[in-house]
Curated annotation (Swiss-Prot):
Cellular component annotations (GO), alphabetically ordered: cytosolic large ribosomal subunit
One GO MF term attached to the UniProt entry: 5S rRNA binding
SUPFAM superfamilies assigned: Translational machinery components
Annotated protein name in UniProt: Large ribosomal subunit protein uL18
Source organism per UniProt: Ignicoccus hospitalis (strain KIN4/I / DSM 18386 / JCM 14125)
Gene3D superfamilies according to UniProt: 3.30.420.100
Recorded family membership: Belongs to the universal ribosomal protein uL18 family.
Function: This is one of the proteins that bind and probably mediate the attachment of the 5S RNA into the large ribosomal subunit, where it forms part of the central protuberance.
Subunit (UniProt): Part of the 50S ribosomal subunit. Contacts the 5S and 23S rRNAs.
Length: 204
């Protein structure tokens, strides 16, 4: 509802909470590719995008659905480990296209320390695509899914029925949640092998 003669109606995507146009404008001024991370309740997708007068140009992209279809991922599509792997996949494709540097674009996500979106940015840096990020990245244990495995192990011992109910989808896919870190490493190795990249040294 209008609030006076000087009130300016925000653009539709800003009203819908999809785009911060001021942030987008400042990124455009940098003339650097953007490392874009977006997520839904079920999936995450990462794109490396260049600004162009005729419209944004997608240089590389990856969706967490690909992890399942191409690399045998059995975990959740929007879990922290899946975000990392999706970011890694997009970054490797960007590097293959000749991109060496990008600015982070997390949209309207709050820059909370340890947030899932920063797992994708950490993955990019781990494989050699420079994307500036501070000390907000999740720690290595959470990226590997150790928090999921630990909780599952505890729940299995204390309440087997609740364990079966809560992790029903994973168990149906043939993944014991206690094996999340092992499964993460297996899928990560497949992605790196696919792009002929040696296992990167990880940082905490």
């Amino acid at each position: 509802m209008a609030r006076g003669p000087r009130y300016k109606v925000p653009r539709r995507r800003r009203r819908e909470g999809k785009t911060n146009y001021y942030k987008r404008y400042t990124m455009a001024l940098s003339r650097k590719p953007r490392f874009v991370v977006r997520k839904s309740n079920k999936y995450v997708w990462v794109q490396v995008i260049e600004f162009a007068p005729e419209g944004d140009k997608v240089i590389a992209a990856a969706h967490s659905k690909e992890l399942e279809k191409k690399y045998g991922w059995k975990g959740y599509g929007n879990s922290l480990p899946a975000v990392y792997l999706t970011g890694m996949l997009a970054a490797l494709r960007a590097k293959k296209a000749g991109i060496q540097y990008a600015v982070p674009d997390i949209g309207l996500h709050k820059p909370t320390k340890g947030a899932r979106v920063f797992a994708a940015i950490k993955a990019a840096n781990d494989v050699g695509l420079e994307v500036p990020v501070g000390d907000v990245v999740p720690d290595e244990s959470r990226i590997r899914g150790e928090h999921i495995a630990s909780y599952a192990e505890s729940l299995k011992n204390e309440n087997p029925e609740e364990y079966q109910r809560r992790f029903a989808k994973l168990l149906e896919r043939g993944l014991k949640p206690e094996d999340y870190p092992k499964h993460f490493e297996e899928v990560k190795a497949k992605i790196l092998e696919d792009y002929k990249v040696e296992q990167p040294a990880t940082t905490g």
